[in-house]
Regions:
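Short, low-complexity disordered leader/linker segments with a strong preference
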Residues: 1-69, 452-464
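Hinge/lid segment of periplasmic solute-binding proteins
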Residues: 47-62, 127-181, 209-212, 316-323, ...
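Extracytoplasmic/periplasmic substrate-binding proteins
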Residues: 57-59, 73, 81-88, 234, ...
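Helix-loop-helix "hinge/cap" segment bordering the ligand-binding cleft or interdomain interface
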Residues: 89, 97, 149-153, 164-234, ...
Length: 464
């Protein structure tokens, strides 16, 4: 009887020990899960996933169940009508209230909203023409801080300066990269330069001196009917972009030092008679794509659609793309940012992350709209997308995406934009038609006029 009670006590103790062990194991498991939940989410990881059983799925560390409403101002209605429905498939509880705003009116509308305290968008775009002015307003959030935790290291190497303000804060991501080379008419290149192959043309035109000499030959062979670059401002855009470097320090603008070298090459082209008489983005310039009186044009990833297809719709197979002599440059471009005083920062970031950074969003944004993001991982993970090409490749008989990324991106540099960059560009635009026509004005005289025009628009600045 005593032995039976003893055996029963041992069984009871054994059962209790097993129960305690199970409870402790469960606590350890729950504690581990709690540690995972409180860790900082990575806002740059790709793919929709659930972190643990029973948890809501995330995209880039952002819960896809996130709720809220954001205001977006954009000038590309086709982008909005395509991407917003795709975004809502992943983030169904977010309402995107968008307004189509002309890019020429964007900055004025934004400044009016900020000044009056009326509606300001949560997601703000910054076209290159006014990006420095926008960044200097100090109304954009630093994307390397909470709640975004995006790192500059993820960007293509030339982009951080172009997406940072003068304090060094990363305040935007790229809507679509804009490394640029030279697009050219294959028929004219073959007739006047002897080849339409981009590699052979690069060998034939290794620098701008060779380009000018060949341009003189083209002028003579065509009786002056065919030029190398369609406009004075097109040539300036290339030459200035290739020599990108900081030249604005606070309110001091080192204009002479910055522009001397590109101006020397630009005016040499003018004096050699190899530039067309058009002004960029005028009706005549647009018509020249199909007319066939000019060989080369600055060409960024957006140009085949908006310049070639739009102006030469019958030009399938007529075009080529090559790196410019002496290197690549940026041509246009738009930053995408979060308003510093937004009440829906996490939701705004979800929109930006999906549309411009995630593989899920880029499957539509790149494949349907042709936009290439500015992050290294896209090109590392989706080389097959680039190799598949786009419908615009038929105009060039070559893979445009690979040409831009492989041949041009490695040579591109960028610099931080300020409000004075916009002023410098405005001053140039007011003067270059005169410089095109009046060949008595040389480099030194033009630089003096340039400095005076900038000073008139920025009297508080020191112009050197």
């Amino acid at each position: 009887m005593k032995n039976r009670r003893l055996r029963k006590s041992w069984v009871t103790l054994l059962v209790l020990a097993m129960m305690i062990t199970a409870i402790l194991a469960g606590c350890a498991k729950n504690d581990s899960a709690a540690n995972r939940n409180t860790s900082e989410p990575s806002s740059n990881s790709g793919g929709t996933s659930a972190n643990a059983e029973g948890e809501a799925p995330t995209l880039g560390g952002i819960p896809t169940s996130i709720e809220g409403e954001i205001v977006v101002w954009d000038w590309d209605e086709a982008f909005l009508t395509t991407m917003v429905p795709e975004f809502n498939k992943v983030f169904p509880n977010v309402k995107v209230k968008y307004t189509v705003v002309n890019n020429n009116d964007y900055m004025q509308k934004l400044q009016s909203g900020i000044a009056s305290g009326s509606e300001v968008p949560d997601v703000i775009l910054g076209e290159m023409n006014f990006r420095g002015q926008l960044f200097d307003l100090d109304v954009l959030d630093n994307l390397e801080q909470a709640p975004y935790h995006f790192s500059k290291d993820q960007l293509l190497d030339y982009l951080p300066p172009l997406l940072s303000n003068t304090k060094g804060e990363l305040v935007g991501v790229d809507q679509s990269i804009t490394p640029a080379g030279l697009g050219y008419r294959r028929d004219l290149a073959k007739e006047y330069l002897g080849t339409d192959d981009p590699n052979e043309l690069s060998t034939l035109l290794p620098d701008w001196n060779a380009f000018i000499q060949k341009g003189i030959e083209v002028k003579e062979k065509s009786g002056g009917a065919v030029t190398m670059i369609a406009s004075f401002d097109d040539a300036y855009r290339v030459l200035k972009g290739q020599t990108e470097q900081p030249y604005i320090n606070g309110s001091t603008i080192e204009l002479t030092e910055r522009m001397k070298v590109p101006f020397e090459k630009l005016f040499a082209m003018r004096d050699a008679g190899i530039l067309g008489k058009y002004e960029g983005y005028t009706p005549g310039w647009n018509a020249s794509f199909a007319k066939g009186d000019n060989i080369f044009y600055p060409m960024a990833p957006w140009s085949p659609k908006w310049n070639v297809q739009a102006n030469d719709p019958d030009g399938i197979g007529r075009w080529g793309l090559m790196a410019a002599p002496e290197g690549g440059f940026t041509y246009g471009g738009t930053s995408v940012s979060v308003y510093k005083n937004s009440k829906n920062k996490e939701v705004a970031w979800a929109y930006i992350y999906f549309c411009y950074l995630s593989s899920e969003g880029m499957e539509t944004n790149y494949k349907k709209l042709g936009n290439m993001p500015g992050i290294k991982s896209f090109f590392e993970e989706h080389r097959d997308w680039l190799e598949a090409g786009t419908e615009l490749d038929q105009f060039f008989n070559q893979n445009l995406s690979l040409t831009f990324y492989d041949d041009i991106v490695p040579e591109v540099t960028g610099s931080t934009q300020t409000k004075y960059d916009s002023i410098v560009q405005t001053a140039f635009n007011s003067l270059f038609p005169l410089w095109m026509k009046d060949t008595s004005i040389g480099v030194d005289g033009a630089l003096e006029q340039f400095k005076e025009a900038v000073k008139n628009q920025a009297p508080e600045a020191t112009i050197k």
